Amino acid sequence: MTHQTHAYHMVNPSPWPLTGALSALLMTSGLIMWFHFNSTTLLMLGLTTNMLTMYQWWRDVVRESTFQGHHTPNVQKGLRYGMILFIISEVLFFTGFFWAFYHSSLAPTPELGGCWPPTGINPLNPLEVPLLNTSVLLASGVSITWAHHSLMEGNRNHMLQALFITIALGVYFTLLQASEYYEAPFTISDGVYGSTFFVATGFHGLHVIIGSTFLIVCFFRQLKFHFTSNHHFGFEAAAWYWHFVDVVWLFLYVSIYWWGS
């Protein structure tokens, strides 16, 4: 900040956007190769380059914000707007999945037997694993709020405890969802019911994994004293994202599991 007279962060040239774009190309091409030719080589290469890009890019962001002081109040304001717009774009993504579900279920075609769930589909009981999943995610929403309040009050130990509980609940949710998929009496290829169910819940499951990763990074950063009560946007963004994942699950549970069954 010694050589500039403004509060904005002029980012240095970085290779990570380019490697990120290349890894995305490799992953999507790898998915096609996996689906059509049962070869995972390209997919594994894409995933590896993606993980390396994420690690090194976020490492640079942490250095710039925590150690070099580039994240001034003005820069943080821009990051907040960016995170809000990102979450809005995710809301629109899920809107598409809900649209597909309601379009198919509110007026079932004769091919589906004129009923919902379609003829031959045995839906999951919403009062079993899905209800447990709901309570797990709601509990994690409480614990992440506890972590945020503890951080604001400067209580580091409580913040770490609450954050650890949130991460554990996120991992537990993922394991429950995986077991539910494994035991489900229908598959993604079982017509429109299977495809809308697995795409919507699977995409949400992916968001839980991303959110858990975000929180794990925050946990290790807090172990190294990176957050203070007035400088912690990395954690705040993770908390916003986690609450978004919570709310989406409530809509999924009510729509697909409860009403849709």
Curated annotation (Swiss-Prot):
* Quaternary structure and interacting proteins, as annotated: Component of the cytochrome c oxidase (complex IV, CIV), a multisubunit enzyme composed of 14 subunits. The complex is composed of a catalytic core of 3 subunits MT-CO1, MT-CO2 and MT-CO3, encoded in the mitochondrial DNA, and 11 supernumerary subunits COX4I, COX5A, COX5B, COX6A, COX6B, COX6C, COX7A, COX7B, COX7C, COX8 and NDUFA4, which are encoded in the nuclear genome.
Pfam families given in the database record: COX3
Q: Which PANTHER family match?
A: CYTOCHROME C OXIDASE SUBUNIT 3, CYTOCHROME C OXIDASE SUBUNIT III
Function, in words: Component of the cytochrome c oxidase, the last enzyme in the mitochondrial electron transport chain which drives oxidative phosphorylation. The respiratory chain contains 3 multisubunit complexes succinate dehydrogenase (complex II, CII), ubiquinol-cytochrome c oxidoreductase (cytochrome b-c1 complex, complex III, CIII) and cytochrome c oxidase (complex IV, CIV), that cooperate to transfer electrons derived from NADH and succinate to molecular oxygen, creating an electrochemical gradient over the inner membrane that drives transmembrane transport and the ATP synthase.
Q: Which gene encodes it?
A: MT-CO3
Reaction catalyzed: 4 Fe(II)-[cytochrome c] + O2 + 8 H(+)(in) = 4 Fe(III)-[cytochrome c] + 2 H2O + 4 H(+)(out)
Does Mitochondrion count among this protein's keywords? yes
Q: Which UniProt keywords apply?
A: Membrane, Mitochondrion, Mitochondrion inner membrane, Translocase, Transmembrane, Transmembrane helix
Coiled-coil region(s) at which residues?
A: none
Q: Which GO terms describe its cellular component?
A: mitochondrial inner membrane; respiratory chain complex IV
Where found in the cell? Mitochondrion inner membrane
How this chain sits in the membrane, per its record, is: Multi-pass membrane protein
Name of the featured protein = Cytochrome c oxidase subunit 3
Primary residence: mitochondrion
One GO BP annotation here?
mitochondrial electron transport, cytochrome c to oxygen
What EC identifiers does the entry list?
Answer: 7.1.1.9
Question: Hey, which stretches end up on the Mitochondrial intermembrane side?
Answer: 35-40, 106-128, 184-190, 257-261
Question: Would you identify the family this protein belongs to, as annotated?
Answer: Belongs to the cytochrome c oxidase subunit 3 family.
Q: Does the keyword Transmembrane helix apply?
A: yes
Which regions of this chain are Mitochondrial matrix-facing, per the record's topological domains?
A: 1-15, 67-72, 153-155, 224-232
One MF annotation (Gene Ontology) recorded for this entry: cytochrome-c oxidase activity
The regions listed as transmembrane in this protein's record are 16-34, 41-66, 73-105, 129-152, 156-183, 191-223, 233-256
